[in-house]
């Protein structure tokens, strides 16, 4: 994975952004399930972590937006996580989250990754091993 910054992510189309997130998840040790088409209930990626205790099925939504992610979007993700009996949901964006969306996610199996966290994670995972 080449070095990347928020400016280059902001210029990506949605499909390329999803591909980047898929590669990131693989680097993090997840196994990616192919997602088929637009009738996905808002799911961009289904990922599995097979680690005992902390592992499970994860539903990932990738949002390459120019405005903050709303509470409504997080509520939708939570509904899908519940319906699909996933252990966790991730909303990964190049943007930020509204305070209402952050508050809604608290105490729920939802992880929010904004643009700053995404860049830090990409930088951490693309550094050479010593």
Residue locations for each model-derived region?
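Mixed-charge (Asp/Glu-Lys/Arg
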Residues: 1-130
